Design a protein with these regions (language model features):
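Substrate-binding cleft/loops of secretory-pathway carbohydrate-active enzymes
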Residues: 143, 207-210, 251, 255-265, ...
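N-terminal export signals
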Residues: 4, 10-31
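Glycine-rich, aromatic-flanked loop segments that form ligand/cofactor-binding clefts
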Residues: 57, 85-89, 116-163, 200
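C-terminal segment of N-terminal export signals and the immediately downstream linker at the start
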Residues: 27-54
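N-terminal structural segment of carbohydrate-active enzymes
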Residues: 44-95, 127
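Active-site-adjacent "subsite" loops/lids of carbohydrate-active enzymes
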Residues: 137-194, 229-244
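Aromatic-lined carbohydrate-binding/catalytic grooves of carbohydrate-active enzymes
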Residues: 82-114, 139-151, 215
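The substrate-binding groove and active-site-proximal loops of carbohydrate-active enzymes
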Residues: 58-69, 100-114, 165-184, 237-252, ...
Length: 316
């Protein structure tokens, strides 16, 4: 399928609707005068080879019923016409867009015998594009809750948390076995099947405090404190301060686990966690900057009045 070139107006409207990944690579600022030949020297030690080669990212965030109706040729043509040299493609986590073999990894109900992710990765490779696969571990379905209730986030009153926007789903605990075991297996499966350049993890750092059995036991073992309750603690409370540091270290440990798992399969790959608004992140951005050669901020246009320059503003 071949389409005529974009007008400027059409390009702005389409990119706003499609969403974007704002990528900063390398992380350390540099002037345009130093760009080009010095790229390799500017990257942190151990940076993957593709980092300095990508400058225009596209993101395709599929929804569950897309496998039955999306147009592969349209999107590959779109990537060409926008001169994108890298793509972030939704692959798994909440919903799998490929024939996963991992128990409880929910396949799109519209997937059938298709491999939507595989088709997209193959098409992008033919265009000589770098590829990240986007996963999202923040929610799951009733079968997982029934089989593994300890994977579900729990509120301060001890209630398992239903999803705030999708009541058929459950919110998962970011700091327990769902991420450390189940999502590690998902990342490994994706990397083994497609050998992509990396995996971008959306909503990986939790959806507020969790009081599940794993969080209670792990926090107590690490600090000696009981989990602080939001209603009765302040930033000066020793338990609250300990929780902030413990949560951050737990997430950095998770990042390290995922990164090591995919690099064992493809040494030139990386895990790239979503850092959101960066300055608004609850994690220490200095530490994050020392750990990675690339940051990514998943900036979505969820409202009709979102301006097309919002992605660039978020990245800055």
């Amino acid at each position: 399928m071949t389409m005529p070139p974009f007008t400027r107006r059409e390009f702005l409207k389409t990119t706003t609707a499609a969403g974007a990944v704002a990528a900063l690579a390398p992380f350390a600022p540099r002037s345009l005068a130093n760009a080009g030949a010095d790229d390799a020297a500017a990257l942190p030690a151990g940076a993957p080879s593709w980092i300095g080669k990508t400058s225009r990212w596209a993101q395709l965030t599929l929804v569950e019923d897309d496998p039955g109706k999306y147009d592969l040729a349209f999107w590959l043509d779109y990537f060409q016409r926008t001169r994108s040299d890298a793509a972030c493609l939704r692959g798994g986590g909440c919903v799998a867009y490929y024939p996963t073999q991992i128990p409880f990894h929910h396949r799109s109900a519209w997937l059938g015998d298709r491999d939507v992710l595989g088709d997209l990765v193959s098409g992008c490779r033919k265009l000589d594009m770098s590829v990240l696969v986007r996963t999202d571990p923040h929610a799951t379905y009733d079968d997982v809750q029934a089989a593994h209730p300890d994977w579900i986030a729990v509120d301060a009153q001890g209630n398992p948390r239903r999803h705030w926007a999708s009541p058929e789903m459950w919110v998962t605990c970011a700091l327990g076995p769902y991420n450390f075991e189940f999502m590690t297996a998902v990342n490994e499966e994706i990397m083994s099947r497609y050998r992509v350049d990396g995996i971008f993890i959306n909503r990986w750092d939790g959806s507020g405090p969790c009081f599940c059995v794993h969080c209670q036991e792990n926090f107590k073992a690490a600090t000696g404190f009981d989990l602080p309750r939001p209603a009765d603690s302040s930033p000066q409370d020793p338990a609250r301060r300990a929780y902030i540091l413990w949560r951050q270290q737990r997430l950095f440990d998770l990042w390290g686990l995922w990164d090591a798992a995919v690099r064992k399969i493809n040494p030139d790959s990386r895990v790239v966690p979503n850092t959101g608004g960066c300055a608004l992140s609850s994690l220490d951005m200095k530490i994050i900057g020392e750990r990675t050669a690339m940051l990514a901020a998943d900036r979505q246009a969820r409202h009709g009045l979102t301006p097309p320059w919002a992605c660039g503003k978020n990245a800055k």
